[in-house]
């Protein structure tokens, strides 16, 4: 279980001496082992900052983060190394998060070598299994990221995350920039993958439509705070907060534009 209690994360305002703002303010969230949770909000709402705190990329300025009872928000490097693979972060810019000089085989082998100390033959076999899981052709191994399509790059990032055998995967705006057809293909693939592996997914998105399609629970975030939480929402009419209703209007406007 991944659990955050009263998380606050502050940043200094550029050009403002000794002036800080709360990117995340007193946020608590709990992710069980399995299921899909979504955090939805506009750009600047603090959701990506929260994702970085939950994945130990950044330490909170206040509050605590626990993974299976271990307070990872105060762990040193050695302790973090032991749990590093348990929470994986898949970023928005797939190509930017992949080493352009490595081929796919090297990208997938790295976590297998560092986290599990696998020998060469076992790494090779596991890479093939990961490609199959991500629905990538096996000859992809010899290619570099820049030679892959946008959809293939997304799937490669997912395969790399799976290589760590995580309990939780956080998708930070990972589906932005995909056209409607490709986006649905990726989302359907992830839903099937989550059901198969029973990994906990946290979907960070500005798109309430994506959150409704994917998630069992939705947290609406605004100005660093979670302002509304719905468990198993059935329709957009379940959202009550005025800001949440603005997000609903944005979805409906987008749908009309696509008709």
Language model feature labels by segment:
Residues 63-71, 228:
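Conserved ABC transporter NBD signature motif
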Residues 211-213:
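A short, surface-exposed alpha-helical micro-motif characterized by mixed small hydrophobic
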Residues 122-139, 248-249:
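Conserved ABC ATPase "signature" region
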Residues 144-148, 152:
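Conserved ABC ATPase signature
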Residues 55:
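Helix-to-loop junction immediately C-terminal to a conserved catalytic motif
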Residues 237-259:
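C-terminal boundary and immediately downstream tail of ABC-type ATPase nucleotide-binding domains
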Residues 16-18, 72-88, 106, 114, ...:
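ABC ATPase NBD coupling module
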């Amino acid at each position: 279980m991944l659990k955050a209690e009263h998380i606050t994360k502050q940043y200094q305002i550029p050009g403002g001496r000794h002036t800080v703002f709360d990117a995340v303010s007193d946020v608590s969230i709990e992710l069980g082992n399995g299921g899909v949770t979504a955090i939805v909000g506009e750009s600047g709402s603090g959701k990506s900052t929260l994702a970085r705190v939950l994945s130990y990329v950044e330490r909170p300025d206040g509050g605590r983060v626990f993974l299976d009872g271990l307070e990872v928000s105060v762990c040193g490097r050695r302790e973090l190394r032991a749990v590093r693979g348990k929470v994986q972060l898949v970023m928005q810019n797939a190509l930017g998060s992949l080493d352009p000089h490595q081929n796919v085989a090297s990208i997938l082998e790295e976590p297998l070598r560092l986290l599990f100390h696998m020998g060469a033959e076992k790494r090779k076999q596991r890479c093939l299994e990961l490609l199959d899981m991500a629905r990538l052709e096996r000859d992809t191994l010899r290619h570099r990221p820049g030679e892959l399509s946008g959809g293939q790059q997304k799937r490669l990032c997912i395969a790399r995350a799976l290589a760590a055998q995580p309990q939780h995967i956080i998708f930070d705006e990972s589906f932005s920039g995909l056209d409607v057809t490709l986006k649905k293909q990726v989302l359907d693939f992830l839903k099937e993958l989550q059901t198969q592996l029973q990994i906990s997914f946290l979907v960070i998105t500005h798109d309430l439509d994506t959150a409704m399609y994917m998630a069992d629970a939705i947290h609406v975030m605004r100005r660093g705070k979670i302002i509304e939480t719905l468990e198993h929402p059935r329709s957009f009419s379940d959202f009550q907060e005025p800001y949440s209703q603005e997000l609903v209007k944005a979805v409906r406007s987008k749908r009309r534009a696509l008709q």
